[in-house]
Amino acid sequence: MFILRLFVYNVVIFFVFLFIFGFLPNDSGRNPGREE
C-alpha cells in the first residue's frame, strides 16, 4: 500500500516536471519579446 502510494506520487511529480520543462521554453520565447 505504501509503495503503491509512493509510486503514484513519483508518477505525478514526473508528469509535473515534464509539464513545467515543456512549458518553460515556450514561455521564455514569448516573455523576453514582451518585456523588452
UniProtKB/Swiss-Prot annotation:
In the bilayer, the protein is annotated as: Single-pass membrane protein
Question: The organism sits in which domain of life?
Answer: Eukaryota
Any S-S bridges, and between which cysteines?
A: none
Primary place of residence?
plastid
Which controlled-vocabulary keywords does the entry list? Membrane, Photosynthesis, Photosystem II, Plastid, Reaction center, Transmembrane, Transmembrane helix
Pfam families linked to this entry: PsbI
Segments spanning the bilayer are 6-26
- List the GO terms this entry assigns under cellular component, sorted alphabetically: photosystem II reaction center; plastid membrane; thylakoid membrane
Show which residues constitute the signal peptide. Answer: none
The record ties this protein, via InterPro entries, to: PSII_PsbI, PSII_PsbI_sf
**Cellular localization per UniProt:** Plastid membrane
The record's annotation in HAMAP family points to: PSII_PsbI
| Complexes and interactors | PSII is composed of 1 copy each of membrane proteins PsbA, PsbB, PsbC, PsbD, PsbE, PsbF, PsbH, PsbI, PsbJ, PsbK, PsbL, PsbM, PsbT, PsbX, PsbY, PsbZ, Psb30/Ycf12, at least 3 peripheral proteins of the oxygen-evolving complex and a large number of cofactors. It forms dimeric complexes.
Q: What does this protein do?
A: One of the components of the core complex of photosystem II (PSII), required for its stability and/or assembly. PSII is a light-driven water:plastoquinone oxidoreductase that uses light energy to abstract electrons from H(2)O, generating O(2) and a proton gradient subsequently used for ATP formation. It consists of a core antenna complex that captures photons, and an electron transfer chain that converts photonic excitation into a charge separation.
The family line of this record is: Belongs to the PsbI family.
- UniProt name for this protein: Photosystem II reaction center protein I
What is the originating organism of this protein? Orobanche minor
Protein's gene: psbI
